[in-house]
């Protein structure tokens, strides 16, 4: 369900739930890797190995189930059918960086390009019939998702590109203040005009 991820009205969840997407599993993989590193630091080699193995297994599972021909999918849990969506949420596995196979990284990069506007990443591709400029997860730019996407791109060595997008985002903040989210086309602030992440 969209409430699990916080993207409650995303078009990825437009069908009746439950849905499975790779975003939350990607975050869980990162957490497992951190637990592995922490266990190693504490001298708990077996626990470290266990968490690393769990991370690797989950990564392989999401690649096998939630990606088709390298393309991230929103999959209906009961039927296994993919839901058509132009949501940025399917790009969030980019946080896994180099853990992703080349084909998957390239497919996510293609989707990111379609979500990119002058100011950053729209949460729904602007050419989508379901795009809403002030529609929460159906169009606006959000600071947290921008940071997550840019962090993944940075890990992939896209440093100049990340700096450019960050500069544009900062320019939007300078122009519009720091609201909860921004109109992805105009850069104007939406909703709470003094939001702090």
Feature locations, PLM:
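Extended glycan-interaction surfaces of carbohydrate-active proteins
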Residues: 1-20, 57-141, 173-197
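A structural signal for alpha-helical segments
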Residues: 16, 23, 43-53, 81, ...
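Peripheral, non-catalytic segments that deliver or gate enzyme domains
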Residues: 21, 134-158, 166
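Active-site-proximal structural scaffolding
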Residues: 21, 31, 51, 55, ...
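Well-ordered alpha-helical scaffold segments within catalytic/enzyme domains
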Residues: 26-45, 92-102, 147-160
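Alpha-helical scaffold segments in carbohydrate-active enzymes
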Residues: 27, 34-41, 50-68, 164, ...
């Amino acid at each position: 369900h969209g409430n699990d991820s916080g993207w409650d009205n995303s078009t990825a969840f437009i069908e009746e739930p439950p849905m499975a997407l790779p975003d939350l599993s990607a975050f869980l993989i990162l957490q497992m890797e951190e637990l592995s590193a922490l266990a190693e630091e504490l001298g708990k080699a077996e626990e470290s190995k266990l968490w690393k193995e769990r991370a690797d297994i989950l990564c392989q599972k999401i690649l096998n189930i939630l990606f088709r021909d390298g393309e991230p999918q929103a999959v209906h849990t009961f039927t296994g059918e993919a839901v058509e969506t132009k949501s940025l949420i399917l790009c969030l596995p980019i946080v896994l960086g180099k853990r992703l196979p080349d084909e998957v990284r390239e497919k996510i990069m293609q989707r990111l390009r379609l979500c990119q506007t002058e100011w950053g990443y729209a949460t729904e591709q602007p050419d989508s019939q379901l795009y809403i400029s002030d529609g929460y997860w159906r169009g606006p730019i959000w600071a947290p998702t921008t940071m997550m996407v840019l962090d993944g791109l940075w890990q992939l060595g896209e440093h100049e590109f990340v700096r450019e997008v960050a500069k544009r985002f900062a320019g939007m903040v300078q122009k519009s203040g720091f609201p909860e989210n921004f109109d992805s086309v105009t850069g104007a602030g939406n909703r709470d005009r003094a939001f702090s992440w």
